Amino acid sequence: MINYKSLSKLFTLCCNIVTVIILFINIGCQTPQNKVSTGEHIISDSTLIQINVDPDGEESYAFDSLIDDISYIKLETNSDCLIGNIHQILCSNEYIFIMDVFVANAVYCFDKHGNFVRRIGKVGQGPGEYSRLCKMCLTSDQKQIVLYDWNRLHYYDLNGKHIKDVSPSFYANDIELINNDFIAGFIEAGMDDDSQRQMLSVYDKDFKLLYREFPSFYNEVFHLNNGMHPLRSFGNDIYLKEPWTHNIYKIEKDRCYEKYRINITNGGYPERPEDMNSDTYIKIVGTKVHMADYVILEDYALFYFSKNGFTWSPFVIYSHKTKKTYKCNGRYYNPLFFAHSPGNTPIVCYDKETFLIPQSATTVMRMKEQIYNSPLINDSK
């Protein structure tokens, strides 16, 4: 059903890490609801897709019955593109962009075969230079890459040529943009200039505020962010996973509406009393099955889950065509197929029906050992 690609990390002689990418393609319940306005610009209506997940349910499918193909892309390693830690990945039609925030503080461009092409931008204070990277985005026409650097947007073409620098009228931890149409900014603590401390702000191309939604969950005892980037771009659409919920919203210029709601039997994020601190709450969350990451493709949406003690990341696939949900049980019968876990780097679309997950060098070597020792391989000799 789905194709999947992997970036694997290979050790160089100086023990720096380069990356390898894994590609998957094709994945696999929608309940109509009365239209309800949950905020001035937030809509829940009949387009809401409710996905019911029972972690202990009997009906499930082998990994290799859900994934059509797996391939691996080994990224080139040389002194010009040493990657210490992958913070974010983006894919255009021609290139794979890797952002390393914490070690290299750089964005590297590779072709689809893993060959290093160029670096995008550089550290500095001049035009087209940045101090500390936060996020990168592709314009929806895939003609420009935008680096977000502590309240500055640096625009480049895909050949690395600097186009312009823009200083927005707001500060955010996370951003996404749709060409010159609108920009979404998000900060968990709430916008500084907003008395209601709402987390999401949507602006037009001139940074004029269009609307704000989602009041901050921060208080005196709880100020813990919910992991990865809340704002994500899949295709030409922007999505927001509301922190500490399983609700995913599609963000548009004049409104946002709830697109997916994940209902987990005996799981999910529990309600949090106002006086509960971050440490106590995260311990409780660890005992529950909860959503870890997701990716939205053209025909499918895939949702990964996590819980303390899990040795792999279970997932379900929702088919937009059949409107059915398929749960993976982690088993496989093809020794070349493995149920890879997404780790701490957000999953990204490689193309319309393929998603990409980075894998460490040690993981790739362990997979090779499993293949060589697999009874499915040895029994066929």
Name the predicted role of every residue range.
Residues 34-74:
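Blade/loop signatures of beta-propeller domains
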Residues 86-88, 131-136, 170-178, 221-229, ...:
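Repeated scaffold domains used in trafficking and secretory/extracellular systems
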Residues 76-86, 106-108, 115-142:
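Blade-loop segments of beta-propeller domains
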Residues 259-283, 321-351:
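Conserved blade-ending motifs and adjacent loop-strand segments that build the rim/top face
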Residues 131-134, 148-198, 212-220:
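Asp-box/WD-like beta-propeller blade repeats and closely related beta-sheet repeat scaffolds
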Residues 79, 121-129, 167-173, 216-221, ...:
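Short coil/turn segments at the loop-to-beta-strand junctions that recur within blades
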Residues 50, 95-101, 143-149, 181-192, ...:
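Short beta-strand elements that form the blades of beta-propeller/WD-repeat-like
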Residues 25-28:
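C-terminal motif of bacterial Sec signal peptides marking the signal peptidase cleavage site
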